[in-house]
């Protein structure tokens, strides 16, 4: 009986430690993928940092992307959510990616998800149209893209990809 109890305790401890290790490793992943019923692979690039283009500004953005692919083809719009950390207290009116050659890629359906003036942030949900997903991700990875945010008080802030975000995008490209 003692051997059975000891064996049972060892099995439980192995299961608990392996599940903890699995969840710990999953939390470290910068890009998550999942197979969808549509037979496409869904990619989720976890929030990565974008720094203010104006180095003196006390602001940054944490941005994430969620989209689907069929092999090498992007087959869905990208849900592009971001949290802007600044002390403006203003709502986000619009946002767009500025690419080389003065090309502007709008983020549509801007919806406020959360806002806290005391903590200095606002979180929004947006849509990046399917035909621009690959172009924007590549431009962000190559530092050829700026996120421009217009606030309802008329101010505009611009953000560039940090090395952290570039690493996340590169990981998504490799999956």
Language-model-detected regions and their locations in the chain:
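A generic "folded-domain core" signal
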Residues: 20-175
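Sec-dependent N-terminal signal peptides
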Residues: 4-13
């Amino acid at each position: 009986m003692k051997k059975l109890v000891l064996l049972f305790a060892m099995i439980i401890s192995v299961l608990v430690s392996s599940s903890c290790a699995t969840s710990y490793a999953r939390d470290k992943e910068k890009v998550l993928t999942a197979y969808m019923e549509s037979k496409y692979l869904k990619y989720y690039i976890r929030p990565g940092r974008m720094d203010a283009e104006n180095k003196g500004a006390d602001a940054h953005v944490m941005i994430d992307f969620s989209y689907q692919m069929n092999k090498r083809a992007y087959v869905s719009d990208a849900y592009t959510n971001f949290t802007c950390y600044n002390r403006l207290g203003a709502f986000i009116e619009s946002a767009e990616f500025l690419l080389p050659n003065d090309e502007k890629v709008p983020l549509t359906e801007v919806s406020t998800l959360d806002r806290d003036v005391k903590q200095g942030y606002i979180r929004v949900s947006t849509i990046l149209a399917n035909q621009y997903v690959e172009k924007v991700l590549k431009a962000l990875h190559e530092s050829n893209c700026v996120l421009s945010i217009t606030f309802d008080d008329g101010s505009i802030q611009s953000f560039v990809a940090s090395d952290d975000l570039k690493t996340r995008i590169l990981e998504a490209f490799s999956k």
